[in-house]
């Protein structure tokens, strides 16, 4: 049985919120002096915000990325973020430098796993219905 309880609107809010927190994380968690940790967090945060802006969901602007693709991207970004302390060699820095990357990365994987690829809204546009071969909801 598949458990998908985070709807696309909540997913959008989480995308922008987590992206912004990652951009600010070097100063929030005081690892702005660890260059690799700082730039990975900022880069991934900006990538998450850009992906959210381009996703075809309620809070997307360009609506170019289908939601199911977005969720796969979230899981991959999460895995990259969780592994980044070892990939970029800052795992031996203080816990404040590597732990946020691991925790947020694993959370991203989990969020992607329990997020619905289908919007709850009733106003699916024609392109979405054709793309996913789903009838409009009554």
Go through the PLM ranges and name each one.
Residues 70-85:
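Hydrophobic alpha-helical membrane segments
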Residues 88, 108-125:
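Membrane-water interface at the C-terminal end of transmembrane alpha helices
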Residues 37-47, 102:
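Structural signature of hydrophobic alpha-helical transmembrane segments
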Residues 124-138:
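Short, highly charged, low-complexity non-transmembrane loops/tails of multi-pass membrane proteins
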Residues 83-100:
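Membrane-helix boundary connector in multi-pass membrane proteins
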Residues 18-38:
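Membrane-helix boundary elements
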């Amino acid at each position: 049985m598949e458990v998908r309880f985070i709807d696309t609107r909540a997913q959008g809010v989480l995308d922008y919120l987590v992206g912004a927190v990652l951009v600010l994380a070097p100063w929030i968690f005081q690892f702005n002096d660890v260059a690799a940790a700082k730039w990975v967090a900022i880069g991934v945060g900006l990538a998450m915000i850009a992906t959210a802006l381009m996703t075809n969901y309620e809070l997307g602007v360009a609506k170019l990325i289908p939601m199911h693709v977005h969720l796969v991207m979230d899981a991959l970004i999460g895995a990259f973020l969780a592994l980044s302390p070892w990939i970029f060699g800052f795992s031996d820095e203080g816990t404040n430098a590597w732990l946020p990357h691991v925790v947020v990365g694993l959370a991203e994987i989990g969020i992607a796993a329990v997020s619905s690829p289908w919007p709850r809204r009733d106003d699916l546009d024609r392109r979405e219905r054709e793309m996913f071969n789903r009838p409009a909801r009554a």
